[in-house]
Amino acid sequence: MSKQEEAELILKLYELRREETMRKARDWFFRDFKPQTMADFNNAMFGDHSGHLRMVITYWDMAAALVNDGAIRAELFTDCNGEHVSVFANIELLLPEIRAAYGPQFAASLEKLIDATPDGRKRTATLRERIKGIRETLAKQQAQKA
């Protein structure tokens, strides 16, 4: 694939992220989806935001598959995207249980990309802690306002 074709794929992925329903799904996923248990995950999977959950995870799993299969170079993809790391960090700790319930291929391409990325698992762990700190700070700020 030419560099121009790769660039066009990257831009297409960006354009798809801007679609209205996808934007709402991403907003929900990063703002409100905080699964600590498999019950939390199942509540989302079968609740009002089922479509949002599936849309975000399958979007980034599909994008990862494009990288894993060589349609987009990993270096270019990771230079242009970081959101996939956050998505994986949000489900990583529950992944064995999720796969037991929903099948072994759940987010498999996303995991493969994370594992192929230098320090990929370290990045997800660091990001998970950073997000936890941000949420704690926001909760304190909300409590002070009340």
Which residue stretches match the model-derived regions?
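Acidic, Ser/Pro/Thr-rich low-complexity regulatory regions
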Residues: 1-146
